[in-house]
A protein has these predicted regions:
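Short polar/charged helix/loop
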Residues: 1-57
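N-terminal, positively charged/glycine-rich alpha-helical extensions of SAM-dependent methyltransferases
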Residues: 56-77, 81
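Conserved alpha-helix/loop element of class I SAM-dependent methyltransferases that forms part
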Residues: 84-102
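Class I SAM-dependent methyltransferase SAM/SAH-binding core
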Residues: 105, 113-162
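A short acidic, Gly/Pro-enriched loop at the edge of an enzyme's catalytic core
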Residues: 163-172
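A short glycine-rich, Lys/Arg-flanked "PGG" loop and its adjoining helix->strand segment in the class I
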Residues: 187-198
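Conserved beta-strand signature within the Rossmann-like core of class I S-adenosyl-L-methionine
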Residues: 200-206
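C-terminal alpha-helical "lid/dimerization" subdomain adjacent to the S-adenosyl-L-methionine
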Residues: 207-255, 261-264, 269-271
Length: 280
């Protein structure tokens, strides 16, 4: 683990870790000189603090959930969940960062609720909204039609980790809750850097992985208490698949994205943002 994680563990659990040696590892950017088995092992441990039994320390390790919600029933159920307040707050913040006229990318658009809200705030924007789930986009197309914003929104079935767009194409890149779905978000972040104009704006937001299962369960009760059991499980799984703020900062730095402000924006979210500027 990184030294800062080890130091944090020692400060939070001095008695549990007294006399124990914490090994700090840094995975190199270039894997070609490492044994494939070692690379696989190290990558599998990304997002976890250490291998210690739960009865000794209770930091929650990252557990992946499926990258794509692929069935129509899942897309419909996801769209029915109450994200109005969260989506509206996201749209307001994103709108404040971009230019008056903008070519916008929404990566992992899901059912297009956020771009619809953005169209109402920024009628001059043109939004390219991509997702890897055809059924999410199918529901999204219905939402776009009902909202009457087809002239502003283009929905495309595209992998955000390998986008077909030219370099320096977009004025602003936004994404809500895509990163916790990705096994390796670095590929996506590198693509963001490539397709964004050098002076472009960025607004990324996702869930924070809680430090313990107890905190995770309390968040589920607080924010999904009125949901059905399947929706509660979806939220719980998403929290456990998320990253810590330290991990996000490391990934953003490794991807070469500069001048971003990265911060904990709620008790369950992190945000990475950068305002558009007329010139660098």
């Amino acid at each position: 683990m990184e030294k800062k994680h080890a130091d944090r563990l020692r400060s939070k659990f001095p008695e549990s870790l007294e006399g124990k040696k914490l090994i700090c590892l840094q995975i190199p950017d270039n894997y070609q000189y490492m044994e494939p088995e070692l690379v696989e092992l190290l990558l599998a441990k990304l997002g976890s603090y250490m291998e210690i039994p739960d009865n000794e320390i209770s930091f929650m390790q990252r557990v992946l959930e499926p990258e794509v919600m692929d069935s129509l029933s899942e897309a419909i159920e996801y769209d029915s969940m109450d994200f109005i307040e969260v989506n509206s707050a996201f749209a307001r913040s994103a709108a404040a960062l971009g230019p008056v006229f903008g070519n916008v990318l929404d990566a992992g658009t899901g059912t297009a609720r956020i771009p619809i809200a953005l169209c109402q705030l920024r009628p001059e924007w043109k939004l390219t909204c991509i997702d890897l789930s055809a059924n999410m986009l199918k529901v999204g197309a219905e939402n776009v039609e009902k909202a009457g914003v087809r002239s502003q929104i283009s929905l495309e079935l595209i992998d955000a980790k390998a986008m077909p767009y030219p370099d320096s194409y977009f004025d602003i890149v936004i994404s809500n809750s895509i990163i916790h779905h990705l096994p390796d978000p670095l590929l996506f972040l590198q693509e963001v850097r490539r397709v964004l104009k050098p002076n472009g704006a960025i607004f990324l937001r996702d869930l924070l992985r809680p430090e313990t299962r107890e905190i995770r369960d309390n968040l589920v009760k607080l924010y999904a208490g009125d949901c059905n059991s399947h929706q509660k499980q979806l939220f719980s799984d998403s929290l456990q698949a998320a990253f810590t703020l330290d991990e996000v900062e490391t990934m953003v730095e490794t991807a070469g994205l500069e001048r971003l402000r990265i911060y904990e924006s709620s008790d369950r979210h992190w945000t990475a943002e950068r305002a558009w500027c007329e010139t660098l």
